[in-house]
């Protein structure tokens, strides 16, 4: 925020595969560039940029979450949710820009968050794609009774929504834990508090979709996702749960990557 206005309409109007790419690959690349600029090009001014990034973080997550709260279209809801996720990632960049020996914690948070977000968001959009192919709609009404029409899709979508919320035993929790932890470690308590409040708001609209899938009357015919989508969904689900249940391996990878990035920046 406030440069997100194009995103919801673009995601909503684009074919779901294109929206998936825009919400994951482009965002990951953008944050890689931003981190590179702040760690190398703006090193002498990093302290001055901290209030700006912190303010953008709060504004971005708040505007994204409260806009998502009003949506009845799941695809559009995830578009605004993607805006809010960018705000959480900015929290990690705030900790990185303090650039002390513990700055690695903020960079770890950014990398972990992006890694978890990649599988979680791709998986969520794949479920939307499968539902849209059968029903022709991405409105929340198309997801009503999904547990009866396609139990596997419903369960995997719950995993992705819980990960986006930041519930333990998911990759999203690992990313949020490191990002929020970095903010607290650098004594940005107010920033972490804003993040927690926003996470609570996000939980409401994510769980609203879960309620529609599990606790509303079944409508429409059974859903059968194409085999390609099924395989991709299984990969995303396993990766999301693996990062939450057995995080040690990915943490080692991220520690190594963070150390190398900071060594180059210094």
Regions found by a protein language model. Name each.
Residues 1-266:
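Alpha-helical transmembrane segments of multi-pass membrane proteins predominantly involved
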């Amino acid at each position: 925020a406030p440069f997100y206005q194009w995103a919801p309409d673009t995601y909503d109007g684009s074919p779901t595969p294109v929206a998936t790419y825009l919400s994951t690959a482009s965002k990951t690349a953008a944050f890689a560039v931003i981190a590179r600029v702040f760690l190398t090009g703006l090193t002498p001014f990093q302290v001055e940029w901290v209030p700006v990034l912190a303010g953008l973080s709060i504004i971005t997550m708040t505007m994204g979450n409260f806009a998502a709260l009003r949506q009845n279209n799941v695809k559009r809801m995830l578009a605004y949710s993607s805006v809010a996720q960018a705000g959480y990632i900015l929290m990690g960049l705030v900790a990185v820009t303090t650039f002390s020996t513990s700055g690695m914690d903020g960079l770890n948070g950014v990398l972990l968050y992006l890694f978890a977000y990649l599988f979680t968001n791709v998986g969520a959009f794949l479920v939307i794609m499968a539902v849209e192919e059968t029903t022709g709609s991405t409105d929340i009404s198309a997801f009503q009774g999904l547990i009866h029409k396609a139990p596997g899709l419903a369960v995997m979508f719950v995993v992705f929504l819980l990960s986006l919320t930041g519930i333990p035993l998911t990759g999203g929790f690992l990313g949020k834990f490191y990002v929020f932890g970095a903010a607290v470690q650098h004594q940005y308590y107010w920033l972490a508090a804003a993040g927690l409040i926003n996470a609570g708001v996000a939980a409401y609209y994510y769980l609203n979709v879960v309620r529609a899938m599990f606790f509303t009357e079944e409508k429409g015919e059974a859903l059968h996702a194409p085999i390609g989508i099924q395989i991709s969904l299984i990969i995303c689900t396993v990766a999301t749960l693996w990062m939450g249940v057995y995080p040690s391996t990915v943490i080692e990878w991220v520690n190594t990557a963070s150390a190398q990035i900071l060594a180059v920046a210094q």
